[in-house]
């Protein structure tokens, strides 16, 4: 009788695990980027305003797509600290946008032969790494939202860390194609963040118990 109960329990767990689908689609950016006025350099009056020029290539890979909803597992978020790295190379931050889960560490690795002054004054995670040389430095981000990063020495350097409270997130490929896999069946809020959006955009989506649902997105 006990073996039968265990078998029934295992069958129920397998059925629950199987009730998950994928979200797929394509993201299209319809607006044209322009330069932005942002806080950058640190002068005698503190962090001053300056221009960050418009990017010279496609920005679709800079979109961050993430899910929120009651059906998502309540287990602790995955911390992929080993993969959360921002390089400083040729006076650029690479990648330009890095999505991470709340509580993750981000590692800053300088590959230039000269130092950088990495900092952010964003509310979710302000920090400062002065005269960052070849030593790899890290910063943990416990708040959610957009963290905008600059270099106090090279004023055109700019990047973003988007901290999300969900394990279900992704960024599109260069062609704009995206996929979020293994989402438990149910209704969710799908959020889209991009550096040029004044605030994240929200879409409602229902994920099936199996298979996939397609949602193309335009920004």
Q: At which residue positions do the language-model features occur?
A:
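Extracytoplasmic copper-binding redox domains, predominantly the cupredoxin/blue-copper superfamily
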Residues: 19-219
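Bacterial N-terminal signal peptides that target proteins for export
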Residues: 1-7
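Bacterial N-terminal signal peptides
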Residues: 7-15
């Amino acid at each position: 009788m006990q073996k039968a109960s265990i078998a029934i329990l295992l069958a129920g767990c397998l059925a629950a695990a199987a009730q998950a689908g994928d979200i797929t689609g394509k993201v299209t950016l319809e607006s044209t980027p322009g330069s932005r006025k942002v806080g950058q350099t640190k002068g005698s009056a503190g962090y001053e305003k300056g221009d960050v020029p418009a990017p010279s290539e496609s920005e679709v890979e800079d979109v961050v797509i993430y899910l929120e909803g009651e059906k998502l597992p309540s287990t602790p978020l995955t911390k992929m600290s080993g993969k959360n790295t921002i390089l400083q190379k040729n006076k650029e931050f690479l990648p330009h946008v890095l999505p991470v889960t709340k509580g993750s560490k981000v590692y800053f690795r300088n590959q230039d032969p000269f130092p950088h002054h990495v900092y952010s004054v964003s509310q979710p995670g302000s920090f400062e790494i002065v005269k960052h040389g070849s030593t790899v430095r890290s910063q943990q981000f416990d708040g959610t939202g957009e963290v905008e990063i600059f270099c106090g020495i090279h004023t055109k350097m700019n990047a973003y860390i988007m901290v999300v409270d969900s394990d279900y997130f992704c960024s599109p490929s260069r062609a704009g194609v995206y996929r979020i896999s293994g989402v438990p069946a149910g209704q969710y809020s799908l959020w889209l963040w991009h550096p040029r959006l004044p605030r994240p955009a929200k879409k409602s989506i229902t994920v099936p118990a199996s298979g996939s649902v397609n949602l193309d997105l335009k920004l």
